[in-house]
Design a protein with these regions (language model features):
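Active-site and ligand/interface coordination hotspots across diverse enzymes
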Residues: 1-43
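Short, glycine/serine-rich, charged loops/turns that create anion-binding
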Residues: 34-36, 68, 107
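A short mixed-secondary-structure module that forms the rim of ligand-binding clefts
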Residues: 35-57
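Active-site-adjacent loop/helix micro-motif of nuclease/hydrolase catalytic cores
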Residues: 38-41, 73, 78
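Amphipathic alpha-helical interface surfaces
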Residues: 41, 45-49, 62, 86-93
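Short connector loops at secondary-structure junctions
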Residues: 58-75
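Glycine/proline-rich loop-helix segments at beta-alpha junctions forming the active-site rim
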Residues: 76-134
Length: 134
């Protein structure tokens, strides 16, 4: 049985989680922005993350984003930077997870607030411009 959940409001998603084994450690993924996944439904990205997490033999994951605005087509000029509420949620998720994997592609930069709040991140690859692959 998979435990699914999310913390969101009308326009933003702050946390999403999928946990299938509470005895194993969890991963925190930090990507660019949320898409359609919610407390019940998985989108393409969440399905990929489930596969990665199972492959790494973790018991589940939390998903946070650089920007909390839900958008199926990322447009960084619409994102609010340094959102206090989003940062607080990332800090909460960080405490629950053993590993942190970042990945936001060419559209995002490593924001100072993330550098100030999280150390020892991993990624699944590096783009030519130095950003972590999505």
């Amino acid at each position: 049985i998979m435990i699914k959940g999310a913390i969101k409001d009308k326009e933003n998603r702050y946390q999403l989680w999928r946990i299938w084994n509470q005895e194993k450690p969890l991963i925190l993924f930090i990507l660019l922005n949320p898409s359609n996944a919610d407390h019940k439904n998985d989108d393409k990205t969440v399905k990929k993350l489930i596969g990665f997490t199972r492959k790494f033999e973790f018991g589940g994951f939390y998903l946070g984003n650089l920007y909390s605005l839900v958008a199926t087509t990322p447009s960084p000029d619409r994102f609010i930077k340094d959102e206090d509420r989003n940062i607080k949620h990332i800090q909460i998720m960080k405490k629950k997870c053993k590993k942190i994997i970042v990945g936001w592609g060419n559209l995002g930069t490593y924001p100072n607030w993330l550098l100030d709040n999280i150390s020892e991140t991993m990624c699944l690859g590096i783009n030519k411009n130095g950003t972590p692959k999505h």
